[in-house]
Structure formats: structure tokens, C-alpha cells
């Protein structure tokens, strides 16, 4: 291989390639918004919400300003507050627990499964018992579809039904994935997702959405999204937020949605190549039978004895970026140590935080470039 190409940096996520592919269609979509000047609540918002709902098979979609606000809006609309407990995995991005804490409720952290990185049903049951022992009222569970693969929604739903909890699916990384033949977006009371630019379906700024089949929740969410407003603009009926998605972002998402399935297929090809080439030297993620992933990340686990920082430095020296999702689980972070964890501890979350590392993953990663990544990974572990 040419020495220059060997060290030429590889993008971790290639948004520029996607931008080039969409080209004039994106320019025209944004230009239409600039022409009609309906920057909030424009026709693209209505169209996007309809298309998101149809894509997932949900009755309703509510666009909003971020994936974090999507979680928070549902919790607020459901009246979650002080004295309540909401169960969520610790091994995830902080927004999951943050949204709970912002309502005044208590996040109770539970463990995950080591091969899928998703919520462990047994730990969930222990977490519910922990919450009750502490005098809290368990009200909800937030499973996370981490790294693009769905949680075990049947198991979560069964536990939630037994305990009288509602389920809020955190699909910030899992929009477009499927579980047992059903697309994410129809499990539980509601699904929250994110359109952050690095997500599989991302806009050109912050954005998010909520999917639900519950008409009553739909109306409350629309109210919460705009300061808790009611029929009289200046007589707010509940506490709310400023959480609208702007029309330019909706226009961008409508164009990206047109190529989304094609990009998911390409991501799966990339994931399959990684798995085939690396399964003998690292622990690769397990894709559950009957499920599909959108591969928001391709996260591997390094063998015992391999120093993660040294490994990452070896790849960086060859122009290959890596990322660590997540170096600390939520219960280990300064702001969240005060909140309880399920009895028995969270050993899997803690172990994952010490040995996971993510490789470049996007729909435009060609076979030759990926081959270079694979060769360097194997060389760094030799």
C-alpha cells in the first residue's frame, strides 16, 4: 500500500460523503424553507411527523429539539416527579438518566448483558426491588437500544406489566432497527429518538422525535413541547419546555429519510465484514436472532491484558480513529453517583467501561478502506 495512503486519516463517521450523495436535493429542500419563511411549524414539520410515524408503524410522531428533550417530554407528560423511580441501564449515554433526574424523580441504574450491551432483565427485576426497599415508587423503565440494536422488548414488557410500569424506549441510537419483525418505534408507551448529526438518521443540528400510539399522550406532548400551552396561548395548563424542531432540520431529515434504508443496508455490510474478520481476535457484538441493527456504532471488546490506550494510540498512528462508548457507566460518574443501583451491583457495566472501543462505522466505508482498518487492528493485537 502507498505509504501516504497508509497514514491518510479515515473519518470515524463520514457525513461529508452523505452530503455529497444528496447534493442538490438538500440544497433545494433548505431553499424551499428559506423561501416560505415558516422556520417553526412549517409544512415540512407536518410531513416529517407523518413520514416518521409511517416508517415505524406508529400512529403518531411528535418532532422535538433533541433526543434528550424527547425523553424528558414523555416523563413530564406522564407526571413523573419526586418520589418516583425510573429504571434505566447504567451503561449508556448520560441523557437517559439525566432526563429522569431533571424531573425530580430518581433514576435507579441496572446492569446490561455483556454480549448485546442492552438491559439485563434479571438486573431490572433487582432494580425494582431496590427502589421499593428505598421507599421509592417504581413508575417506568427506559430500555436503551444501544449501538443500534434493540433491547429485549418482550422481556422488558413482561416485567413492566407485572410491576405496573410504563415503558419508554430510548431509541436515540436504534431508530430504523427491528425487533422480531417490528421496527423500533412501537414498543411500550412511547419511543424517543435522536437526530443528532452523528446518528444513523441525523440532521444538520440537534433534533429528536417521540413515537406513540396513545392519543392522550400525543396531546400532552404537543403541550409540553411549547411551554405547556393549552387552547389559550397565554393560559398555560402545565409546565413545559421550548422543545420544537425547526423547519430547516425537518427539511433535511425528509431528504435523508429517502436514502435511510439503503444506508442501513450498507452499514450492515460493513458490520458483517468487521465480524467475519475480527471475531477470532476480539469479542465482537452479538446480533440477536430475529433482530436487525442500524449499527450506530461497531463496538468491540478487547482481550484481557490489552491496554486500551495503547491499542487506540497504535490505530491513531495509522490514521484510524477510535472512540470509547462509554469510559464510565452512569453510576460511576460524578453527577450520578448519588443515585441508587440495583442490588448486586453492576459488574457487567463496569467491565464494559474498561474494555470496549468502537471502530469507524458509516454507510460509506468502502471495502478497501475497511480492509486497512482491519489489518491495523489485527496488527495492533498481534
Predicted segments, located by residue:
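Active-site phosphate-binding strand-loop segment of PLP-dependent enzymes
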Residues: 115-203, 211
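Conserved coil-to-alpha-helix start sites within the AMP-binding
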Residues: 92-97
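Phosphate-binding glycine-rich loop
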Residues: 37-85, 99-101, 109-111, 137, ...
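N-terminal "arm"/small-domain region of PLP-dependent enzymes with the aminotransferase-like
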Residues: 1-38, 43, 360
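PLP-dependent aminotransferase class I/II
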Residues: 2-3, 16, 45-50, 58-59, ...
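Structured binding elements
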Residues: 104
Amino acid at each position: 500500500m502507498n505509504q501516504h495512503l497508509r497514514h491518510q486519516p479515515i473519518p470515524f463517521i463520514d457525513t461529508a460523503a452523505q452530503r455529497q450523495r444528496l447534493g442538490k436535493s438538500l440544497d433545494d429542500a433548505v431553499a424551499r424553507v428559506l423561501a416560505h419563511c415558516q422556520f417553526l411549524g412549517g409544512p415540512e414539520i407536518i410531513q416529517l411527523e407523518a413520514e416518521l410515524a409511517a416508517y415505524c408503524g406508529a400512529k403518531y410522531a411528535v418532532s422535538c429539539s433533541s433526543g434528550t428533550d424527547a425523553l424528558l417530554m414523555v416523563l413530564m407528560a406522564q407526571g413523573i416527579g419526586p418520589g418516583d423511580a425510573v429504571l434505566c441501564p447504567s451503561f449508556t449515554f448520560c441523557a437517559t438518566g439525566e432526563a429522569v433526574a431533571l424531573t425530580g424523580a430518581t433514576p435507579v441504574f441496572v446492569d446490561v448483558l455483556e454480549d448485546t450491551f442492552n438491559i439485563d432483565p434479571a438486573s431490572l427485576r433487582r432494580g425494582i426491588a431496590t427502589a421499593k426497599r428505598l421507599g421509592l415508587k417504581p413508575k417506568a423503565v427506559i430500555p436503551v437500544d444501544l449501538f443500534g440494536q434493540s433491547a429485549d422488548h418482550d422481556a422488558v414488557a413482561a416485567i413492566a406489566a407485572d410491576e405496573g410500569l410504563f415503558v419508554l424506549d430510548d431509541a436515540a441510537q436504534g431508530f430504523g432497527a427491528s425487533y422480531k419483525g417490528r421496527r423500533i418505534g412501537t414498543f411500550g408507551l412511547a419511543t424517543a429518538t435522536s437526530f443528532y448529526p452523528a446518528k444513523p438518521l441525523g440532521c444538520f443540528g440537534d433534533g429528536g422525535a417521540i413515537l406513540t400510539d396513545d392519543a392522550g399522550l400525543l396531546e400532552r406532548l404537543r403541550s409540553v413541547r411549547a411551554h405547556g400551552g393549552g387552547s389559550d396561548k397565554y393560559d398555560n395548563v402545565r409546565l413545559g419546555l421550548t422543545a420544537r424542531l425547526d423547519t430547516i432540520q425537518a427539511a433535511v431529515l425528509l431528504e435523508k429519510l429517502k436514502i435511510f434504508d439503503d444506508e442501513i443496508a450498507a452499514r450492515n455490510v460493513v458490520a458483517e465484514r468487521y465480524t467475519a474478520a475480527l471475531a477470532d481476535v476480539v469479542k465482537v457484538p452479538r446480533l440477536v436472532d430475529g433482530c436487525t441493527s442500524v449499527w450506530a456504532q461497531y463496538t468491540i471488546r478487547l482481550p484481557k491484558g490489552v491496554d486500551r490506550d495503547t491499542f487506540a494510540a497504535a490505530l491513531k498512528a495509522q490514521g484510524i480513529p477510535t472512540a470509547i462508548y462509554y469510559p464510565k457507566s452512569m453510576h460511576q460518574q460524578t453527577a450520578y453517583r448519588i443515585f441508587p443501583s440495583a442490588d448486586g451491583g453492576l459488574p457487567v457495566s463496569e467491565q464494559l467501561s474498561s474494555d470496549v472501543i468502537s471502530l469507524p462505522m458509516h454507510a460509506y466505508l468502502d471495502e478497501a478502506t475497511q480492509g486497512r482498518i482491519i489489518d491495523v487492528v489485527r496488527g495492533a493485537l498481534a
